Every structure is written in C-alpha cells, then in structure tokens.
Amino acid sequence: MQSFIHYFLHLVFPLFIAIVFFRKEWKKVYIVLLATMLVDLDHLLVSPIFQSNRCSVGFHYLHSFYAIPVYFILLFFRKPFNIIGIGLLFHMLTDFVDCLFMFNGCKICFSEAPAFQLLETISDLLGITT
C-alpha cells in the first residue's frame, strides 16, 4: 500500500492538480509537475544510491531543509516558476508521507535521520504512532 500511495502521489495526483487549478493549460502544467521529479537526481550524489530505510527529506541536497524554503518562494513568482514550486513542494510532501510510513514501521531505523524529530512530532500529532 505504501508504494501505491507513493507513486500515486508522484504520478497521478499532479494530474488532478493540473486539471483542477490550471484547466486551460493542464497538459503543459502536468508535464512541468512531472518534470519536478528530476529533483530526485540528487539521490545519485550519495552512496548507496538507494537505501530502503532512508528518508530523503532532510537527507538529500535538493530535499534539504535549506532547499524547501526556496521552493516555497517560487510560489510567488510567475509561471512557470510558481508551477515548479508547486511541483517541488508537493514532491517533498509525497516523500515525507513515504518517510512517515517507514518511520512508523521502524522508528529505531530513523534515529540518525535529519528528519527524525519532525517525523516523530507529525506522527504524534496525527496519532499514528505505533
């Protein structure tokens, strides 16, 4: 279920965003939103490239707590920058949801993660602690 939700949020939900909020140009917007998945190229800069229990939010350069405010600032610019900001922020949210799934499956696995405190706080607020 975790993988389904993760890929649904990455690939299908942006289509809903494009159609609902940018009806006249939804195809272009959807392509831009999908293109923001290129932010995952920062995964190639670490070793190992894939680690099953690693939360990308707060760990990878373009998923860092320094990069996320820049993505928020993009919302205040004109197209296409605001659409890029929407895509990047939604990507971070999607990855964070994935981190929550993993965190609640194995908290000790994330004890050294940069996002540990945030994951713990959000899990407590949502009442999804195990």
Regions found by a protein language model. Name each.
Residues 1-130:
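N-terminal membrane-targeting hydrophobic helices
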